């Protein structure tokens, strides 16, 4: 039962250091394997329209990073798979669960993507289980990620249906308002939800949402994530597809949720909002900084690789991360 677990989120946790065994943080290996491929970092930009487009996906794949292309350009998905495969790059796409998606999946036999993410807000659903089974029947070699979920029961059901990984997080993201609109979600206790779900998982878990700092990546690994999906930290770059808007001489980029009226084009069943983020530099600069910060985290863990973060002790001190720093 959930009540047996302490409830906390990223800002409530600090990891406890161990003796360092490497001479330089540069020796720490941040790579992670998901399915048949190994990637430079255990992070993936959120599959949202203001985070990545085909060009960003290509840049990530060429750089050795995992990506998941969003599902909001449905007609462009097959040409995208071809574009990536023609360059010797992995193809990683998203699908929904509507009836026409079944025919779409069946069309992929000729040019099969390495990864498919079933991407709906409430992933513990018969419709998702049915789609997992369909993909596995039609494309048995494709790695299937299913989500989003927030309970151990959901993780087990999706794994049993054939999912190769589950995505955990119901509404903790910066532009997600699910918890406000519906009363449901993992916002405010996403890290505890991740821990709860990970204890039931036999296959990889992708933590999705609520990441506000690079240190949250290490915390996610500690509590059971194999990969971490990140939205706001990857939004607002020069390469980001979001519109650039000038306000009082300062450059901003728009960032909106996948269930917002800005994505849907209509105000119906809205569970996302739009915000403006100060424009950042290049995406690669953020990826490099994430890698360096994760290398430092591994060194503090007394480890040499990402998996060593899973064994560190931690302390729960509510909202302690910004103690003594009034600017936050």
From Swiss-Prot:
Record has NADP as a keyword: yes
SMART domains: IMPDH
InterPro entries for this protein: Aldolase_TIM, GMP_reductase, GuaC_type_2, IMP_DH/GMP_Rdtase_CS, IMP_DH_GMPRt
EC class name: oxidoreductase
Keywords associated with the record: NADP, Oxidoreductase
GO cellular-component term (any): cytosol
Record-listed E.C. numbers: 1.7.1.7
Entry's Gene Ontology molecular function annotations: GMP reductase activity
Pfam families, per the entry: IMPDH
CDD domains per record: IMPDH
Binding annotation for NADP(+): 205-228
Catalytic reactions of this protein: IMP + NH4(+) + NADP(+) = GMP + NADPH + 2 H(+)
Active site: 176 (thioimidate intermediate)
A GO biological-process term: purine nucleotide metabolic process
Family the UniProt entry places it in: Belongs to the IMPDH/GMPR family. GuaC type 2 subfamily.
Annotated function: Catalyzes the irreversible NADPH-dependent deamination of GMP to IMP. It functions in the conversion of nucleobase, nucleoside and nucleotide derivatives of G to A nucleotides, and in maintaining the intracellular balance of A and G nucleotides.
Protein name as it appears in the record: GMP reductase
């Amino acid at each position: 039962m959930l009540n047996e677990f302490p409830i906390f989120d990223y800002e409530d946790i600090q990891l406890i250091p161990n003796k360092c065994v490497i001479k330089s943080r540069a020796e720490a290996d941040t790579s992670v394997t998901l399915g048949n491929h190994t990637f430079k970092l255990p992070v993936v930009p959120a599959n949202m329209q203001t985070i990545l487009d085909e060009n960003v996906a290509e840049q990530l794949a060429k750089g050795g990073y995992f990506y998941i292309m969003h599902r909001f350009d449905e007609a462009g998905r097959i040409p995208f798979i071809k574009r990536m495969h023609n360059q010797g790059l992995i193809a990683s796409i998203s699908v929904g669960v509507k009836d026409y998606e079944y025919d779409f999946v069946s069309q992929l036999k000729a040019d099969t993507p390495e990864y498919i993410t079933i991407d709906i807000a409430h992933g513990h659903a018969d419709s998702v289980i049915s789609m997992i089974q369909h993909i596995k029947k039609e494309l048995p070699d494709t790695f299937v990620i299913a989500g989003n979920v927030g309970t151990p029961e959901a993780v087990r059901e999706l794994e049993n249906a054939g999912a190769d990984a589950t995505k955990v997080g119901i509404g903790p993201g910066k532009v997600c308002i699910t918890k406000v609109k519906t009363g449901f979600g993992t916002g405010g206790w996403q890290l505890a939800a991740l821990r709860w779900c990970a204890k039931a998982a036999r296959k990889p878990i992708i933590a999705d949402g609520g990441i506000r700092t690079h240190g949250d990546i290490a915390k996610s690994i500690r509590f059971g994530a194999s990969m971490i999906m990140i939205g706001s930290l990857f939004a607002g770059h020069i390469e980001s597809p979001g519109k650039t808007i000038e306000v009082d001489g300062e450059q901003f980029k728009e960032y909106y949720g996948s269930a917002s009226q800005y994505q849907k084009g209509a105000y119906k069943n809205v569970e996302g909002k739009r915000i403006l983020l100060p424009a950042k530099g290049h995406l690669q600069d953020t990826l490099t900084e994430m890698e360096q910060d994760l290398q430092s985290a591994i060194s503090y863990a007394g480890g040499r690789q990402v998996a060593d973060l899973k064994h560190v002790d931690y302390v729960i001190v509510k909202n302690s991360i910004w103690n003594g720093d009034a600017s936050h």
